[in-house]
Amino acid sequence: MAYKDARQVKIAEKLVILNDRAAGMMTRIYNIKKSSGDSKVKPQFLSDKKMEGAIKHIVRKFPVVDCRSNSSTFEYVQEKSTEITKSLSLYYYTFADILDLKDHIMQVLTTMESCQCQLDVTLNYDLTTSYLNLVVHLVTMMILLSRIEDRKAVLGLFNAAYDLQHGQSEASFPRLGQMILDYENPLKKLHEDLGPLNRLIYSALSSVTHTYQRRNKTADSWRTSNVFSLTAAPAQILYAAQTETIACEYLSLDVIDRWIVFCGTVCHSTLLNDDNIRHMWQLALQMNLCLRVFRDETFIVHQEIQAFLESSKEKSKRLQDVKDAFNHASVTAVAVHADRRRFLRSSLRELSLLLRDQPGLLGPKILYVWMALGAGRDEVIWLLRHQVEVPAISKKGSRMVEELVDRQLPELLFYMLELRDLVTKYYAVIQRYYLQYVSSYDSIVVSEEINQANGLTQEEAVLLTDFANEIGNINSDTDLRALRLDWFRFQAWTSAARSHFQLSRHKKLAIYMNTSVFHLKMIDLQDEMLRETSDLSLYCFYPKLAEKHWLNCLQLPAQARYVLSFARLAAHFTSALHDMCPEEKAFITEKALAQCNSVIEETCKQLSYILEKVAEHEFGLAYQMTPSAVAVRVVAQVVQQKGSGKAAAAAAAAARDYFIAGEESYRVDRQALTMPDKLQTTLLEISAALGAHRQIYVADHTFAPRTYLAQSLETKFVELLHGMFWEGQPHASNPKRPSEMLLALQAYMTVLQNLDTAISVDISNTMQTTLLQQTQLVDSKNKDTIAALYTKWYLEVLLRRASSGHMVWSEHLRTMLSSGQEQLSFMPDHYSDPQELRALVQIIGPYGVKLMTERLIWHVASQIMEMSKIVATYKDALQIARSNFDNAEKMKDVLNLLSVEPKDKKTPNATCAADAILQRTIIIGQICLFRDALHDALRHIVESKLPFLQASFDMLYHNLDDVDKVKIGEMSAAMGVTGPVDMSLVNAVRAQNPNIHPQEHYVNSCLLMVAVAICIPRIGMSDLSSYKPSIQASLNNSHCVPMAINTIGSALFHLHEQNDIQSRMKEFLALASSGILRTIHERDNSRQISDDVLRSHTTLYIILEQMVRKNRWLSMDVLETCFPYNLVRTAYQQCYEADAQ
C-alpha cells in the first residue's frame, strides 16, 4: 500500500506547486515588511495617535485580546472598524495564507518521511532538489515572518475590528496568533518541527557531499583543472560535454550553502553527528559571513547560529565550531572569493571570445556556459550581500571592508552578459543541435536501458516507454514539459522504500534520463536556464550599492567600457516579480527603467565632461599661436635678456604657462601618461561602452545609448558655448571676444569630430543642429542663444556707449575706437574691428546677422520715430523753411526757433530741438555704419566659404537695375550686400507707423529731411566736430551724418512709392548747402574770426561732400551747381594740415 500511496499523494506535483507558492508567499511577506517600514505606504491606522492605546494593548495581550471588557480603549477601533478591516485585510489574509502554506508543506514533508523516500541528488535530482528547496523555503519564510515588526499589531487590530463587527473573532485567528508566538524564535520552533524529519533531510544532504566538495574549491584548484576552458583538451572540443551528474554541474553554490547551513542548523542535534555533513556545514560557515534569506534580507550566519545554539537546552558542543568558523571566515573568505572572481574574469573572457568567434560550439559545449554563468552569479551575489552586511558585523580596524571593494566587478558582469547574449542570439543553433542529439542518441540509449530494466510495473513501464518514444520522434512543437514532469513523477514513485523498482539499483537509467532531461531543457527552456544560472535581479534591491558600483566604474578608465553592464542588468529586475504579488510590478519596473536611464545619462554626462576637458586643452594649444600669446612670450624674452630683477621675474611668471607647439609630444618614459593622454584613454573607453550596444531592452522599453549621447553632447555643447561666452563667469559684464570665442568653438568642434572615430554617432548633425539653433533668437529649450546674447551686448553696451560719445567710429580702420573721454571696461576695437566681426559672423551665421541687423534697424526706426515727433511739433515752421529755402532771414528764424533751449529744466540733459535732431541723426549713422561693417564681414566670409555661390550671385546682381536690386534686397542682405534701399528699415518704419495716413506721413518725411538739412550747420559750432583724416572721423561722430541722411532718405521715400527719391535728395542738398553757405557768409561778415570756427566749418564741407559721394541719386555735378567744390578741397587740406601738426 505504501507504493500505491506514493503515487496517489502526487508528491512530484505538490513539490512543484508548493515551491512556487512558497516563493510567491515570501514575495508577499517581503512586500509587507518593506511597506510596514515605510511611513509613506504604511497602513495609516498603525500611525494614528488615536489608535495608539488600542495597539499597545493588543501587542501586550497578544493573541488574547478582549475588546468588550476594554470598551474605552477600543472605542475608536469600533468607530473605524469597517475601514480597518478593509485596509488590513490584505495583510491579515497573507498571514493566514502563510499558516495554510506551512501546514501543506509540513504535510508533504511528513508524507515523504512516512513513504521512506530515498533521496540522492545524483539519481533523482528533481525530487531531491525540490525537497531541499521546500525545506529551505519553509525555514526562510518563517525567519522572514519573524522580522515583520508590526505583525502583532496588524493581526490583533484586524481581529479586534472584525470581532467588533461580527461579534466573534476571525476563524483562523487563534491558530494564526499561536503561530506568531511560536515563531518569535523561528530556528527554535523549526528545530522542533523538522527534527522528526531529519532522516530524509540527512539522506538528501548526504548525497550532496561529493558535489559540494568538488564544486566548492579555491581558484587555484579551478586553474589547475582548467574547469571552464574549452581549449584545455583540443581533441575533444567538438564532442558534447557530458558528465554522469550533468545537472549538478551548474547547481548554484549559493543554493547548496543555504541547504547545508539552514538544514544543518535546524537539525543540528542529528545531522551534524555525521562527519561528512558536519564538514560541509563547517566549510559553508567558513566561506560565508551571511546568507541570503530572500532578496536583500540576509541571515548573519555565525551570530544567528550562535544565539540559537546558546538558547538550546543541550548547550550544543557545536558552539566552538561556529566560533572557529567565524574566525576562519574573517581571515580567508574575502580573499578566496576575490581570487575566484579574478579567475572567472579571465575564464569568462576566454569563453566569450571563443564562442563569439565559433558560435557553433554553443551546441556541444553549452554546459560550460551554464557552469561559468552559475559560478559568476554566485560570486556576484556573495559580494553584494557581504558588501552591505560586513561593515555592520566586522570588528573595528578590520580590513575586510576594504578588501571587499572590487573595482573590476563590471568586467565580470560584462562577460556574463556577453555569454547570455550569445545564448540568446544563437538560440536556434542550440535548439537544432539538441533536437538532433536527443532523437539520434538519447532516445536510443534510453530505450535500451528501459528494455533492460527489471521490476517495473505496467504504469511505470508505459511512462518510460512513452518518454523514449516521444524523444525519438521529437520536433520543435513537442510539449516537453509533460515529459519532464513524467520523469519527476517516476522519481517520486520509485524513491519510496517499498517500491518494487529501486532507482538506486539502476543508476545508468537515472544518468541517461537526467542527461536527456537536461538536453530537453536546451530545446525549450533556454530562457529559464539563463534565469536559473545568471539572474542578477538581486541588484534591484541594492540600489545604493548598484549606484556606487557604476559610479566607481566610470571613475576607473580601465573599467569604463563595461559601465553599461549596469544598465543592462536592469532588464533582470522583472524576473524578481511573482504572480502572487502583482502590486510590485509597477514599482520594480519603475526601478529598472530608472537605473537604466540613470546609468546611460551619467555615462553620457561623463563623456561630455571629458570632452570639455579635452577641448580646453585643445583651446590652450590653439591659444598659444594667437598674436596675444606670442606677444607675451616675446616681451618676456626681451625683458629677461635685458637684465634680472622683479621685472624679469614677473615676465618669466607671465610666460611660464606658455609652451612651444610640439612640446606636449615629448616623452621621457612611455609609461608616464600626461593628462591629455589619460583623458583620451578614458574618452575612448567610455565611447566603446556607449557604442557597444545600439539598443538596450528593459521592461518592454527600448533605450538607445547613442541617442542619449547625441542629446547629451548637444546640451553640453550649448552649456560650453554659454560658459565660453562669459569666460566662465555668468555675471561678467563683457563677453569673450568673437575671435577667441571662435577659436574655442573650433577647438571643441575638432574634439567632437575626433569623437566620430571612436563611436558611430552623427556628430555633424549634432553640431549643425546646435550651431543653427544658436543663430536664432532662442533655442529649442527657449533659452537665449549666442546670437541673441551678442546682439544684446552690442546694442545695449557697445552702441549705447558709442551714442553717449565714449567711442568714435573710424572709417579708415572700420572699427570703434575709444574717444578717451571715459575709461571703458573693454577695448572697443576688440569687438568691432573687421577681424572680430568676421569671427562674429562665423559664430552667429547669416541668421544671426539677420537677427542683429533687424534689431539694429529697429533702433534706427525708433530714432526716426522720435525725430518725427519733433518735426510734428515744428511742422508749420518747417513748411515755411521748405518753401523759402532761398530766403536767408526766414531760414535763420527757423533755425533759431529750433535752437531755442527748452524751458522745462526738470528733465536732465534736455537739449534744443536742433541738437536732438542732430544727435539722433548721428546715432542712426553710427548704427548704419556698424551694420554695413557687419555686412562686409559677412560678405568676406561668404566669398571665402562659398565662392561659387558668391560668383553666381554677383553675376545676377550686377546685371540688375536699381528697381530689381531693391526687390531682392533681403537676399542681397543675406549675402552681405547693401542694396540701393534698406528694405529692412522700410519695413521697420512701416511697422512702427501703421495708422498714419500715407499723405500725412509723406509730408512728415519731407519735413524731417528739411529739419536735418536746416540743423546741419550747428555741427560746426562744436570743437569735437573737427575732422581727423588719420582715422577719418570726428570725435563726436558727426562724420556719420552722411550715412544717416542717405539711409533715411532712401528708405522713407521708397516707402511712399512716389519715385521721387532723387528729387527729395536734391531738395535736401539745396537746403543743406544754402544753410552752410549762409553760415559762411555770416562768418565772413563777422568781425571776430576764430581758428576753431574755421576748423569746425571745414567739417560741414566734408560732410556735404561725403553725403553726395556716397549717395546713389546725387553726383558731384549736382553738388557743383549748389556748392563750390574748392571749399571742399580747401577743407580737406586744412584738416590734413591740422592733423599733421
From Swiss-Prot:
Q: What happens when the gene is disrupted?
A: Embryonic lethality with cells differentiating, but failing to become organized. External hypodermal cells fail to spread over and enclose the embryo, but instead cluster on the dorsal side. RNAi-mediated knockdown results in reduced egg laying and in defective endocytosis by oocytes characterized by an accumulation of aggregated yolk protein in the pseudocoelomatic space. RNAi-mediated knockdown results in abherrent inx-3-positive gap junction formation along the adjoining membranes of EA and EP endodermal precursor cells at the 16-24 cell stage of embryogenesis.
Q: Which residues does UniProt assign to the signal peptide?
A: none
Q: Point out the coiled-coil segments of this chain.
A: none
List where in the cell it is found: Cytoplasm
Q: In which tissues is it expressed?
A: Expressed in neurons.
Superkingdom of origin: Eukaryota
**Keyword Membrane on entry:** no
Q: Which Pfam families match?
A: Nckap1
List the GO cellular component terms: cell junction; SCAR complex
Among InterPro entries, the record links this protein to: Nck-associated_protein-1
Key words, A-Z: Cytoplasm, Developmental protein
Which GO annotations describe the biological process of this protein?
actin filament organization; cell migration; cell morphogenesis; cell projection assembly; collateral sprouting; cortical actin cytoskeleton organization; egg-laying behavior; embryonic body morphogenesis
What function does this protein fulfil?
Rac effector required for tissue morphogenesis, cell migrations and egg laying. May play a role in egg laying and in yolk protein clatherin-mediated endocytosis by oocytes during oogenesis. Plays a role in the formation of gap junctions between EA and EP endodermal precursor cells in embryos.
What family does the entry list? Belongs to the HEM-1/HEM-2 family.
The record describes its quaternary structure and partners as:
Interacts with aco-1, gei-13 and gex-2. Interacts with gex-3.
Q: What is this protein called?
A: Membrane-associated protein gex-3
Q: Which organism is it from?
A: Caenorhabditis elegans
